[in-house]
Amino acid sequence: MSAIDDLPPLREVIRAHGLSAQKSLGQNFLLDLNLTARIARGSGPLEGATVVEVGPGPGGLTRALLALGARKVIAIERDHRCIAALNEIAAAYPGRLEIIEGDALKVDVRPHLDGAEARVVANLPYNVGTQLLVGWLSTDPWPPWFSSLTLMFQREVAERIVAGPDSKAYGRLAVLTGWRAQARILFDVAPSAFVPPPKVTSSVIHVVPRAEPVPCALRDLERVTEAAFGQRRKMLRQSLKSLGVDPLALLSETGIDETARAEEIDVAGFLALANAFGRARGGGTGDAAGA
């Protein structure tokens, strides 16, 4: 009998610890162990891996990660009610589960890795998922401390992460992701898989960081994409005026049609614009402010 067989069913755990999902924390619990195993396997072979999990809740995905061979799981949980349930899993897998009670937006996990390369696997709380992803993709220095991100999002958000030009979902999030990583949707998850069921379909995505992304200052890319997509219906010669430099000069330098709109420009085009903007403001290309 394996350690996971010694643990009570998740529904019993939820009942025993009074773990009704809290909307304020963006909680939707996954109880189907076949599904949690599928999510865990989506990150690749787990034997010997160090995994960071955000928002484990009662520990359905945590169990799967450990049962599939993760050497160590570092679980960051904000909800104090869930800690006792996670401690039960830790007891079943001695020395392999470290529980950090805290807000993942504020916790620096790197000191807990002991120099090991880690991957992130998580059913992210819906209310902070995008903010967490942006933080991870903005990591400095780069390459980052993680080798991959396997994450659950609302389907609409997942589409915004992986979108390409000429689509309604394409925007700032897709440009940031495409600059620093390669992302794809692995599969969808129906609302009925969760307790309580959300109103929308969810998707699991897999993100692999690029070892050497095009040099660019993050702050310049953020300003350019904010200006361009903030007025996405306007031509770039108009929308980029808010940058405080001559937009026609930027577009001419980068060879981009001045009548183009934001959704028509690929990631490489935005990186070229950001670097041209950096030079125009006197910051250079890929300077220390987030390069």
UniProtKB/Swiss-Prot annotation:
It catalyses: adenosine(1518)/adenosine(1519) in 16S rRNA + 4 S-adenosyl-L-methionine = N(6)-dimethyladenosine(1518)/N(6)-dimethyladenosine(1519) in 16S rRNA + 4 S-adenosyl-L-homocysteine + 4 H(+). Gene3D superfamilies: Ribosomal RNA adenine dimethylase-like, domain 2 (1.10.8.100), Vaccinia Virus protein VP39 (3.40.50.150). Disulfide bonds: none annotated. SUPFAM superfamilies: S-adenosyl-L-methionine-dependent methyltransferases. It is an enzyme of class 2 (transferase). One of its GO terms (molecular function) is 16S rRNA (adenine(1518)-N(6)/adenine(1519)-N(6))-dimethyltransferase activity. S-adenosyl-L-methionine binds at N28, L30, G55, E77, D103, N123. The keyword Cytoplasm applies. Specifically dimethylates two adjacent adenosines (A1518 and A1519) in the loop of a conserved hairpin near the 3'-end of 16S rRNA in the 30S particle. May play a critical role in biogenesis of 30S subunits. This is Ribosomal RNA small subunit methyltransferase A. It comes from Azorhizobium caulinodans (strain ATCC 43989 / DSM 5975 / JCM 20966 / LMG 6465 / NBRC 14845 / NCIMB 13405 / ORS 571). The gene is rsmA.
